[in-house]
């Protein structure tokens, strides 16, 4: 169990967990540490999804991230992946120390399976005031074919 997921973020716990992670005899069917961290990042990243007649809009909170820190990708399986990472400021002023650390740091991630009518070539992403808006246009439905009339001849 990763104690960092439960709020124990002291360097001593990091050392203990890193040491425990070196055990090569662990159960191979257990979820990997990366999977668990990704699952936590996905659960902690709120998102709204809207369906319009011509598009789908994904609205995701990405607080504290610049547009260059956010990655939006679509893979071959129609999966839209949105990720970024917010890091703690490395610089500390002389004599200053944190009394309380409540702002979330770490990985932000969401994955969505796009519907078949999503146009993977027409995706836009705009980040403003810590909110990312990803718009995926729909492929227009095919025009219904008119029935062909066949002339009946007298034989």
Curated annotation (Swiss-Prot):
It holds the Pfam family HSP20. The keyword Plastid does not apply. GO terms for cellular component: cytoplasm. CDD domains: ACD_sHsps-like. InterPro entries: A-crystallin/Hsp20_dom, HSP20-like_chaperone, Small_HSP. Its main location: cytoplasm. Keywords: Cytoplasm, Stress response. Residues 38-153 form the sHSP domain. Induction: By photoperiod, by light treatment of dark-grown seedlings, and by heat shock. PANTHER family: HEAT-SHOCK PROTEIN 20 FAMILY MEMBER. Belongs to the small heat shock protein (HSP20) family. This is 17.2 kDa class II heat shock protein. It comes from Ipomoea nil (Japanese morning glory). The lineage of its organism: Eukaryota, Viridiplantae, Streptophyta, Embryophyta, Tracheophyta.
């Amino acid at each position: 169990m990763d104690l960092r997921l439960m709020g124990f973020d002291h360097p001593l716990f990091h050392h203990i967990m890193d040491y425990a992670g070196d055990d090569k005899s662990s159960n191979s069917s257990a979820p990997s540490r990366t999977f668990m961290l990704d699952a936590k990042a996905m659960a902690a990243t709120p998102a709204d999804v809207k369906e319009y007649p011509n598009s789908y809009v994904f609205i995701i909170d990405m607080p504290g991230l610049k547009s260059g820190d956010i990655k939006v990708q679509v893979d071959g399986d129609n999966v839209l992946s949105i990720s970024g990472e917010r890091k703690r400021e490395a610089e500390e002023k002389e004599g200053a120390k944190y009394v309380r650390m409540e702002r979330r740091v770490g990985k932000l991630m969401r994955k969505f399976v796009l519907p078949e009518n999503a146009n993977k070539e027409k995706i836009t992403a705009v980040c403003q005031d810590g909110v990312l808006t990803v718009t995926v246009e729909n492929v227009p439905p095919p025009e219904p074919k008119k029935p062909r009339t066949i002339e009946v001849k007298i034989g």
